[in-house]
Amino acid sequence: LGAKTIVFEHNVDALMAYQEFLYDHSFTSLIKCYFIKFNEKFSVKYATALIALNKRDCDGFERLYGRRPEMILPITSPKVDLSLVLGLSVVNKPFLLFVGANFYPNIEGAIWFIEHIAPYISLDLRIVGACCENPTLAYKTIPSNVKLDGYVNDLSSYYKSAVAVVAPIFKGSGMKTKVIEAMSYGKSIIGTDEAFQGIECDFSRIGAKCNTAEEFIKAIESLSDNLFNPYTYQVFSDKYETSTVENR
């Protein structure tokens, strides 16, 4: 029909599907791999313009389908008026925050943190989101300093009250929405290489980039009591705040 189309790819979905198959080795995941790659191939082929979230995804599309996206447009988030956000009144102990949907990289990351980090730190870990309903996590024996809060009415109060946000994510594609969201609240963030994909900053100032249990524990032990990280908030305002990107 000659219609022009713009495809904004938030992941290299074929790679995500393959990672899921490696995670659960199910026949369903294997079938999904083939169908997703088939559909993605034609989406990339026939799009008038292709947009990706970061350089890694551009490389992935070029490697799989022979086409490099014409534009990189990162995930953004609206500016938060922090003066209007109330802290958690029912929590009086310092805590780390993990936020995640019921998605296998989140489940894998949360369980890894519970097993390898939580028993060796003094801070509580509060896990928020649909990931808490996943049976693998919901029925797991957890240390006393881990709280599965599940769905919450006001996520902003958790962000404001947390000492830091942790993102122990080891698989994925695209960018991590919850990391950008945490930045919009000016939080210190301790995450993996995967968690920080597409984010340009001094990771030692935003929190820490960690990929081993030892690195996570060391970074957590080095956290200050300051609940607001001005450097994180400045990076967000300069690079990932929605209106800033729209006005470029």
Over which residues does each language-model region extend?
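Short alpha-helical segment that forms part of, or immediately flanks, the ligand-binding pocket
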Residues: 156, 177-184, 198-199
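Donor nucleotide-sugar binding/catalytic pocket of nucleotide-sugar-dependent glycosyltransferases
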Residues: 7, 30-37, 41-84
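Short acidic alpha-helix that forms the nucleotide-activated donor recognition element
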Residues: 41-45, 153-163, 184
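Acceptor-binding helix/loop patch of EC 2.4 sugar-transfer enzymes
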Residues: 6-38, 92
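A charged, aromatic-enriched C-terminal amphipathic alpha-helix characteristic of glycosyltransferases
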Residues: 225-248
